């Protein structure tokens, strides 16, 4: 376990929310001209958390606690979470890297660090770390989901689907897992299976706007723009939905449209 970890260490419901969803969908389609990256990345459409003065104060308070005892794993996790809430994802990953080096057998730390590597785009390193964050005898569905996201970002869709399917055996019908699996099917050019899986995800009680937006995206890729717009209107205004459908039309017309999809997926809970 230390070998892989050392190698990684050395290779370094408001209007506002609806508007944010519209922007995020455009970003996911590759048409918004922004570099928004979603958490866990395990992908598509998600908000990063509060960027309020309270969030900054919490980060500053936790920074003091962390600097006083950087070996405390739980403080490191809390501090990294606060950094993420203020969009300091690279710093959060660095904090978790140091915590992992100090606590190489702490699977909670390794899991958090591995997920942070996915978030900052270090997918191959993430796979190395996440492999040590749980065991076949005691698998964690959230870690499996993150492994799936990393694999999907690397274009390894068959492997990604295997991780998502394994996670679903532990957490049946989890909407974020189903949505991520559906995105992977879409990236594999299997749009019918993608739609079937996305609809199952959207039908779950815990499904949120991100899951429904992913379903709308797949429907748009299949040319079913009216259906896509009807789904988007559940979470945004008619004008916003129409704008996003217009972007879907542009995406569907591109020869390489599937390459514009967000490979990471929807972040799992917890």
Regions found by a protein language model. Name each.
Residues 3, 25-26, 30-78, 82-86, ...:
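N-terminal leader/linker segments that initiate helical-solenoid repeat arrays
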Residues 39-40, 205, 209-270:
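Terminal, low-structured helical/coil segments at or just beyond the last alpha-helical repeat
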Residues 68-69, 102-103, 133-137, 170, ...:
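Structural marker of alpha-solenoid helical repeat scaffolds
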């Amino acid at each position: 376990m230390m070998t892989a970890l050392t190698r990684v260490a050395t290779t370094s419901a408001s209007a506002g929310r609806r508007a944010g969803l519209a922007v995020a969908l455009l970003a996911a389609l590759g048409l918004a001209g922004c570099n928004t990256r979603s958490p866990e990345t395990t992908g598509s459409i998600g908000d990063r958390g509060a960027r309020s003065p309270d969030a900054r104060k919490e980060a500053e308070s936790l920074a003091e606690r962390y600097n006083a005892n950087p070996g405390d794993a739980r403080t490191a996790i809390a501090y990294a979470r606060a950094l993420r809430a203020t969009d300091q994802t690279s710093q959060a990953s660095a904090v978790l890297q140091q915590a992992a080096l100090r606590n190489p057998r702490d699977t909670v730390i390794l899991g958090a660090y591995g997920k942070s590597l996915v978030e900052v785009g270090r997918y191959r390193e993430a796979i190395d770390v996440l492999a040590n964050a749980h065991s076949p005898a005691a698998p964690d569905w959230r870690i499996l989901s993150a492994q799936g996201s990393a694999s999907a970002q690397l274009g390894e869709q068959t492997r990604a689907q295997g991780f998502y399917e394994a996670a679903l055996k532990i957490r049946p019908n989890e909407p974020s897992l189903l949505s991520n699996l559906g995105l992977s099917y879409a990236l594999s050019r299997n749009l019918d299976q993608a739609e079937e899986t996305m609809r199952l995800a959207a039908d779950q009680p815990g499904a949120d706007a991100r899951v429904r937006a992913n379903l709308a995206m797949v429907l748009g890729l299949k040319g079913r723009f009216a259906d896509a717009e009807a789904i988007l209107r559940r979470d945004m205004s008619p004008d916003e939905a129409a704008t996003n459908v217009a972007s879907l039309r542009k995406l569907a017309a591109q020869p390489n449209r599937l390459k514009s999809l967000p490979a990471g997926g929807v972040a799992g809970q917890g």
